[in-house]
Amino acid sequence: MAMFLRWQPIGLGLGCFWLVAGALAAPAPHTHAAPTERPTWTRYPLLQAQATRGESAGGVRIDAANLPTPTLVMHTVARTDGQTLSGWRASREQTGSGHVWFSASGARDDHTVLRASTHVYLPGKPLSPSALLAQRRDGLEIVPQRLPEHGGVRETSQWRFQVRFNGQPRPNVGVELLTEPGTRRVWVSDARGEVEVTFPRDFPEAALAGPNRMNASQGFVLAVNQAIDGRNYLSTYAHRYYPDRMRERSLAAGVGALGFGMVLAAPLIRRKRERA
């Protein structure tokens, strides 16, 4: 059975860390935190938010996994102090427009403090998310330094994230990236508590089938596990990423090269037939 990862510095001057337990790639049963029950591809605490349609148009549905009896809090651009939600849906009146940040907290039987975070973008009046990202929140968390809007995160793109505890940067901390296809990479936060994450080019061909291949998406989670003041914390940030745009160009170039090759080969084929 796969175990959770723990990172501990082995020398503050060197900024090193070591791995206490094994990998977490094996699928895990979904906890009953959210009203819907879905399988998940990681044992890390996971929070996902999706804009809803229909009767609650413009609202957001939130799903949680691997979080025992979590408490859900929503932060918006207009209300950065946080609002505790009683359910797993947020109406458009609650969210407003722009970026909305969600975090869910809980605890394991071994008293490890768990937190999972994510965000969703809702179209509307453009508002800067800088105050939302800079807000001080208690506990251990991973925060992107900028939030994707229309383009989203894509394979091979680079994004910076910061590890914080009670709003303060945490240097020399191991940060693990795990993607839905199973890619795993690790970085160590710098003096500002930041890591620059390069997303892998790991979409399987099956996921790119169909006419809208560039709109395919897969999940990822960033995780940090650290003991602070005698207490263990495990926090994650999860979202989705999309195929590299170069895949589209590569396909077009391949089709073009094939067509050009056929044009060049046509006279040779014709001459061969005439000689025959």
What would you call each of these model-derived segments?
Residues 26-50, 116-171, 238, 243-246:
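Beta-strand-rich domain onsets/edges
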Residues 86-121, 206-228:
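Short, aromatic- and glycine-rich surface loops/edge beta-strands on solvent-exposed regions
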Residues 80-90, 94, 185-206:
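Glycine-centered loop-to-beta-strand initiation motif
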Residues 167, 179-181, 228-230:
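Solvent-exposed strand-loop boundary residues in beta-sheet-rich modules
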Residues 72-77, 143-147, 174-188:
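Short amphipathic beta-strand segments in non-cytosolic proteins
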